[in-house]
Amino acid sequence: MEDAAAPGRTEGVLERQGAPPAAGQGGALVELTPTPGGLALVSPYHTHRAGDPLDLVALAEQVQKADEFIRANATNKLTVIAEQIQHLQEQARKVLEDAHRDANLHHVACNIVKKPGNIYYLYKRESGQQYFSIISPKEWGTSCPHDFLGAYKLQHDLSWTPYEDIEKQDAKISMMDTLLSQSVALPPCTEPNFQGLTH
């Protein structure tokens, strides 16, 4: 109790031991005070004594290592976000390209009413005019009068699918239809089912 009443003795201890005010490299020590919160400490010596200098070095290394880990974690997360942004940009570019192609195909000359689900064949005249026909190059044979540019299937959302992608697109649509039918289907009985809860 005599130590608590003699703050000067505490200052002497601090001066003799030469406690540094703060640790370097970003680390900082807690401020030293003999009366924290206005209350005198029982033993200021045991609470304010200077530690091993190696402890201060370890503290600074720990702070530096924490900074490195935080920076590495932030970099990893930003890398994932950047990859997602790049993927979304590619998807957006493809959506715009498909929309531009579909709009152009809808403006191609055609003497028949186009119906979703059918395949139409795109030809080009010598004059440069493009037109749709329901006659395929195979049906024309060697007597095809114009250049064949490609075949497209008109989907029910009025988008166009190139002939080489029809099978893959139909598989996607079939899978989506299956998922929608399963999610919309309701169970035959709407009453509570207690089967298995009682013997």
Swiss-Prot record:
Coiled-coil features, chain-numbered ranges:
71-101
- Top-rank lineage group of the source organism: Eukaryota
Gene Ontology terms for molecular function: identical protein binding
User: Which parts pass through the membrane?
Assistant: none
> Which keywords describe this protein according to UniProt?
Coiled coil
Q: Does the keyword Ligase apply?
A: no
NADP as UniProt keyword? no
Q: Where is this region: Disordered?
A: 1-30
Which PANTHER family does this UniProt record tie to the protein? SIMILAR TO CHROMOSOME 1 OPEN READING FRAME 50, UNCHARACTERIZED PROTEIN C1ORF50
Identification of the protein by name = Uncharacterized protein C1orf50
Q: What is the lineage of its organism?
A: Eukaryota, Metazoa, Chordata, Craniata, Vertebrata
